[in-house]
A protein has these predicted regions:
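Lipid interaction determinants
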Residues: 14-118
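Sec-dependent N-terminal signal peptides
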Residues: 4-12
Length: 118
């Protein structure tokens, strides 16, 4: 009986976590928000970032380049030597929250244009 109760509460916590997520953007909404703009923010796993997302699908950071693209309702990145990494996003105004595994794991501020001349 304890096992079933533990499983029930574990499952319930997953539903609560998913219910706490902000509304997720469509692929088209993500593309419209980031293409041609810079996003500055922080990710739980890797810390601060500043990236420019060119309309041609190129990502530029301070000392690197990568590729970005929309697949369905996810934004995917391909950094040199790394596997493709796809995330969902919640966008409200100029604020983006990056969502993976039903958790917000990063945030950013969308700034118009290539403000750092990457």
């Amino acid at each position: 009986m304890r096992f079933y109760l533990a499983a029930f509460f574990l499952a319930l916590s997953g539903y609560a976590q998913a219910a706490d997520l902000p509304p997720l953007a469509t692929g088209e909404q993500i593309k419209k928000a980031v293409a041609g703009n810079t996003v500055e923010g922080s990710m739980q796993a890797s810390g601060r970032y500043t990236e420019f997302y060119a309309k041609d699908g190129t990502v530029s950071g301070k000392d690197y380049k990568a590729v970005w693209r929309i697949e369905g309702d996810s934004m995917c990145w391909i950094y040199k030597g790394q596997p493709k990494d796809c995330w969902r996003a919640s966008i409200k105004g100029t604020t983006v929250q990056w969502v993976k595994d039903n958790k917000v794991q990063g945030t950013g501020n969308i700034v118009k244009g290539n403000v750092n001349n990457f």
